[in-house]
């Protein structure tokens, strides 16, 4: 069978995944997520702060570590072509894939480099996880996140406020103050990430953890203390949030 409709062919090509055997330019979405063509990959074996996650630096000052983690990955890639070995659907976000991604010509994965630089955590449960030595070295050298105080990215995303404090600058006698800084009531909005997210029990009816609000939603102005900020609807959906029902039909994030 031969396709003669150029519009149909273009539509099909737009939804085909990038050939895993080819290298392509990457768009960095956060410290452990990149997009190649129309395919979004979470880097396998690691986790990094979401763009809106705050940390505390070595001087006990608030630190936008999620933004820095994203920028560090952008700097690491440096516009060079990226090759990803696709290893399947991301179990935490069905529209995304897991990938072992490398700069073309470099045998070391982006995952390993980010863990060694201290901007991502090893998440493999095994004590002999691939990146355990890299994480131990980063912690010992006070690199990246480890120079300050932070919570595991997964615990920030789930709002687990009583989780373990990580890093080399977490004095035990300041526990309450540190947690207040890591889970602030007034979470700062990262630049160009103006989608508001709010955890909501009613969202569980649809299998979600919260609701996101675009600027075109009637609820947007009245939501003054969002729990999360997202840069795109895809990011919000990957985090388990659904769109508010009071958004205008056809509304899009700006």
PLM regions: where:
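Bacterial N-terminal signal peptides that target proteins for export
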Residues: 1-8
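Short, surface-exposed secondary-structure junctions/capping segments
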Residues: 54-65, 124-143
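Bacterial N-terminal signal peptides
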Residues: 8-18
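Mature, structured domains enriched in cysteine- and short glycine motifs
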Residues: 121-129, 144-254
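Stable alpha-helical elements in mature extracytoplasmic
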Residues: 69-73, 106, 110-111, 115, ...
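Bulky hydrophobic/aromatic "packing anchor" residues in well-ordered structure
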Residues: 43, 114, 138, 212-213
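Electropositive
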Residues: 22-119
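N-terminal leader and targeting sequences that precede the mature domain
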Residues: 41-47, 82, 108, 129-145, ...
């Amino acid at each position: 069978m031969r396709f003669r409709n150029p519009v149909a062919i273009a539509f099909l090509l737009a939804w085909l995944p990038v050939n895993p055997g080819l290298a392509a330019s990457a768009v960095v979405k956060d410290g452990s997520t990149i997009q190649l063509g129309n395919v979004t990959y979470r880097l396998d074996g690691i986790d990094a702060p979401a763009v809106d996650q705050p940390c505390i630096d070595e001087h006990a000052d608030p630190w936008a570590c999620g933004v820095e983690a994203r920028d560090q990955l952008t700097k690491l890639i440096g516009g060079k072509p990226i090759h990803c070995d696709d290893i399947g659907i991301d179990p935490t976000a069905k529209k995304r894939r897991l990938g072992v991604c490398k700069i073309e010509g470099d045998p070391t994965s982006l995952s390993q480099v980010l863990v060694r630089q201290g901007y991502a955590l090893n998440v493999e449960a095994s004590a002999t996880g691939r990146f355990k030595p890299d994480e131990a070295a980063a912690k010992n050298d006070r690199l990246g996140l480890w120079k300050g105080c932070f919570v595991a990215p997964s615990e920030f995303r789930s709002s687990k406020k009583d989780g373990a404090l990580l890093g080399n600058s977490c004095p035990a006698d300041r526990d309450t103050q540190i947690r207040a800084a890591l889970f602030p009531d007034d979470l700062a909005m990262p630049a160009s990430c103006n989608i508001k997210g709010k955890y909501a029990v009613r969202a569980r009816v649809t299998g979600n953890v919260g609701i996101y609000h675009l600027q075109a939603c009637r609820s947007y102005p009245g939501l003054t203390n969002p729990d999360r900020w997202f840069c795109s609807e895809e990011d919000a959906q990957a985090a388990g949030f659904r769109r508010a029902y009071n958004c205008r039909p056809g509304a899009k994030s700006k």
